[in-house]
A protein has these predicted regions:
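A juxtamembrane structural motif centered on a specific transmembrane helix
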Residues: 1-6, 45-49, 173, 338-342, ...
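Alpha-helical transmembrane segments of multi-pass inner-membrane proteins
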Residues: 109-136, 150-211
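Transmembrane alpha-helices of multi-pass inner-membrane enzymes
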Residues: 346-357, 363-393
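N-terminal signal-anchor transmembrane segment
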Residues: 1-47, 62-74, 126-132, 354
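Aromatic-anchored transmembrane helix interface
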Residues: 34, 54-68, 75-100, 114-120
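Long extracytoplasmic/lumenal interhelical loops at the membrane interface
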Residues: 258-317
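Flexible juxtamembrane loops connecting transmembrane helices in multi-pass membrane enzymes
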Residues: 233-269, 294
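Hydrophobic transmembrane alpha-helices and their immediate junctions
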Residues: 45-51, 176, 217-219, 223, ...
Length: 393
């Protein structure tokens, strides 16, 4: 098995491995997989790296070392050591070998199908288990589905990756049977209570649906029944409970935006306030991996990360680290979307899929969200090329 195929197969394990991450004896499982993937990525990218990316990777090492120097140990979250570098390596790989990456996903149809089936069986069975549901008092005491993960924000990224893989399978094979596998992850979106992931999941479906509709007026007409259907489903699901719990009233603890964002805007304000008090070198290269946790710990009973990619990376790796992150996302979008001259609506939807997650939840710290984003871009590109080819015949 060559390194590209090995990388493809390792990446596809994340949605299944993540399900078991909360098990006491398996807490290490995702971290071990992530380290293996990083080793393979380093092997693949360092061999034939463009000078531009070599300079960027060197800078990433510099900001990482500086962040470690600024960190007061022990770490609140040891995973933070890996996320940022992993994302940059992933970006370098996909932008350097776009055709190679696409070909290996095509060749692994059966493997992808087995991963989707295994995830669907595990999560599907858990739907009927009372232990898969939790009462969250912070979210209005609603009953939320977490499957065997124990956490809605651990389950939701796996749902997103499965939806991406299912749509990717359909785009690459044109076999409609794969679309039935969307049902369980959509149930997960509706019942886990994450408004961000529910919205992102719907945007992913809309992006593929827009390309599918050859006559675009059909797409816009179809939005009417789809909006009505989703409205009914949301109002009668845990998502509706979460929306009701985060609706601002005169009795709300936070202000309007604080209530809507579950207090995130309060953390953001504190994080930025203390970041701008740092010296210019720390602002350029970052304040360390614990900076955001230490700030919230000082003012609240628990330490929290920023829940925002831009602020988190700014605090950890400074202006330079944030600039590299934004450039890496642009590089991916340019390679798979912008250079293909895709319709403006598709470009907008893809941008919002990344931006909403990065802004209101965090994108680069959820492995399944990170891993499935380039896969979604590959599937959209291949499907768009296929539809354009048919239209030109």
């Amino acid at each position: 098995m060559n390194a590209n195929k090995l990388l493809c197969r390792l990446l596809l394990l994340f949605p299944v491995f993540t399900l078991f991450q909360s098990f006491p004896l398996l807490r290490w499982i995702n971290k071990a997989l992530l380290i293996c993937v990083i080793i393979v990525l380093l092997f693949l990218t360092v061999r034939k790296m463009k000078k531009r990316w070599a300079g960027i990777l060197f800078t990433v090492v510099v900001v990482h070392v500086y962040a470690l120097m600024q960190t007061t140990f022990p770490l609140y979250n040891s995973n933070m050591l890996f996320y940022y570098g992993f994302w940059i390596l992933l970006t370098i790989y996909y932008t350097s070998y776009p055709e190679c990456a696409a070909s290996y996903f095509k060749e692994n149809e059966r493997y992808i199908e087995k991963i989707v089936q295994l995830w669907s069986v595990i999560v599907g069975i858990s739907i009927f288990m009372p232990s898969s549901y939790v009462i969250n008092k912070a979210w209005g005491s609603g009953r939320y589905f977490v499957s065997i993960t124990g956490d809605a924000f651990r389950l939701a990224p796996t749902c997103l990756m499965i939806v991406t893989l299912v749509l990717g399978l359909y785009c690459l094979t044109k076999r409609k049977k794969y679309l039935f596998y969307i049902i369980i992850p959509m149930y997960g979106f509706l019942m886990c209570g994450s408004r961000t992931y529910l919205g992102i999941g719907l945007l992913v479906v809309l992006a593929f649906w827009y390309i599918y509709c050859e006559k675009k007026r059909y797409f816009y007409f179809s939005l009417i029944p789809l909006v009505i259907l989703m409205g009914i489903l949301i109002l009668n699901s845990a998502a509706g409970s979460k929306i009701a719990a985060t609706t601002y009233t005169t009795n709300s603890f936070f202000d309007k935006w604080g209530t809507i964002t579950n207090g995130r805007t309060v953390f953001w304000s504190l994080d930025l306030k203390y970041f701008f008090k740092e010296n210019i070198l720390n602002q350029l290269l970052g304040c360390g991996f614990n900076f955001d946790y230490q700030i919230t710990k000082r003012f609240y009973t628990a330490a929290h990360w920023a829940h925002n990619d831009f602020i988190s990376i700014l605090l950890n790796f400074g202006y330079i680290g944030l600039g590299i992150y934004i450039y890496s996302v642009y590089g991916l979008l340019k390679t798979f979307i912008l250079d293909m001259r895709m319709p403006k609506l598709v470009v907008t939807l893809v941008f919002m899929i990344w931006f909403l997650n990065a802004m209101f939840n965090m994108f680069y710290t959820y492995t399944c969200s990170m891993v499935c984003f380039p896969m979604m871009l590959i599937a959209l590109k291949e499907y768009y090329m296929f539809k354009v080819g048919i239209a030109n015949e």
